[in-house]
Amino acid sequence: MDITHFGHSALLVSLRGGTGARAGEGGAGESDTTRILIDPGNLSEPSLTHLTDLDAIAISHQHPDHAHPPYLAELFAHNSEAAILLEPQTAQALSDNPETSRFRERFTPLAPGQRASVGPFPVTVTAAGGTHATIHPSIPPVGNVALIVEAAGEKTLVHTGDSLVPHPEIVGADVLSFPLVAPWSKMHETIDFLRIVKPAVAFPVHDRVASAEGRAIYLKQSRAFAPEECEVRDWPADAEPGQGRTLSF
């Protein structure tokens, strides 16, 4: 499994069924690869709108830093065969949005406990959870689902969206993307979340609301206080601009 970070919470997940073949290495070809784009929002790299050959586009919740209608309209148009998997309130919001409403017949709402199978190499995406973390009691809550990506021969990926609730379905995940810093989180909540979920590997997302210096502080604390069995990895720093940064598992 390769995971490419296009900034903030946007992830391109490529799964090849545990063949070990990476791009350019031979073995499984692109036709054997399932590609899922998660949470392309307005803090992500604009270059992600040029992605094609996607098998699914999955959205954890409706906030624009995870679901940016101008980006989504381009992606939906460029990927006419892609499944569009949406937290239910997000499906309604995008159905009502003039930039994305024309694609509504392709929308598949994914409520907690529901799952969908996508791609030439079968991959299951399951929703868990249900509610966005509280920003302030005066702000109406919105739906949010953690997205669990599973395939035979691959490690399981959990993408939590905007929540630090350790739902039973995500405890013990092989690979976890965790919100590093947010208007709705505290450092001790992030550390407690990592300690309860106990992923084998965790990597940061939701980080463009912090300066580079601030991000480094949050990442240092996450690494220092994560459980011993959890490796907190960061994205490589040497990627070409606009191409995303990739970790392989």
Question: In which residue ranges do the predicted regions lie?
Answer:
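Binuclear metal-ion centers of metallo-dependent hydrolases, dominated by the metallo-beta-lactamase
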Residues: 4, 96-119, 191, 195-249
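Conserved N-terminal glycine/acidic-rich loop preference
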Residues: 35-37, 47-67, 93-121, 222
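Active-site metal-binding motif and surrounding structural segment of the metallo-beta-lactamase
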Residues: 42-86, 172-177
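Short internal beta-strands
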Residues: 81-89, 201-206
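Catalytic metal-binding/acid-base residues of hydrolase active sites
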Residues: 63, 90, 129, 164, ...
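Active-site-proximal segments of metal-dependent phosphoesterases and phosphodiesterases across multiple
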Residues: 173-190, 195
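Core dinuclear metal-dependent hydrolase active-site scaffold
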Residues: 1-52, 109-172, 183-186, 235-249
